[in-house]
């Protein structure tokens, strides 16, 4: 049997959310632009948003980082108990996003086996980093995950698939 590092997962998606306020960029973006994140806070204020469930890494050095992490965990608990999410058990989800130039990019939401991952430069593992990992950011990421009732991964896996046999065939099954 062929094994793969990519697997199905129990996936939570917001139901009845204003997606213009729900979706935010990954926590490791705009790390030198606190004004970007301040604008996102203004835009999402009072709304259910993924922003309330992540720790933007621009705040990693702040004195109140532990308080922010505690708030993230509380928000996760309340979103789950309030029924904000629809759960898709043992699933993979086909997604499309339209870039600003109009090009549509397709992908699959799933899980990777972290035992197959190695972020070190030159790694030959099944799953490896395409950009340098900032090792100093790992401890706070672990702190956010420890005791958290939900995971909000922010990675994108690129697949070497010259035959276009992984993602492209799924387009015909949209909506199933």
Show the residue positions of the predicted features:
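A cross-family signal for N-terminal binding/gating loops and helix N-caps
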Residues: 2-176
């Amino acid at each position: 049997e062929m094994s793969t590092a990519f697997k199905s997962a129990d996936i939570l998606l917001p139901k009845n959310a204003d997606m213009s306020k729900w979706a935010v960029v990954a926590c490791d973006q705009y790390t030198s632009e606190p004004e970007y994140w301040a604008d996102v806070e203004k835009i999402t204020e009072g709304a259910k948003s993924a922003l309330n469930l992540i720790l933007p890494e621009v705040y990693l050095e702040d004195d109140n980082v532990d308080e922010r992490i505690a708030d993230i965990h509380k928000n996760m608990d309340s979103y789950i108990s309030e029924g904000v999410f629809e759960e898709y058990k043992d699933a993979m989800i086909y997604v499309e996003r339209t870039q600003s130039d109009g090009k549509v990019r397709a992908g699959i939401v799933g899980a990777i086996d972290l035992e197959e991952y190695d972020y070190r430069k030159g790694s030959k593992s099944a799953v490896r980093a395409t950009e340098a990992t900032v090792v100093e950011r790992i401890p706070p990421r672990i702190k956010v995950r420890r005791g958290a009732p939900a995971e909000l991964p922010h990675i994108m896996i690129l697949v070497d698939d010259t035959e276009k046999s992984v993602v492209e065939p799924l387009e015909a099954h949209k909506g199933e």
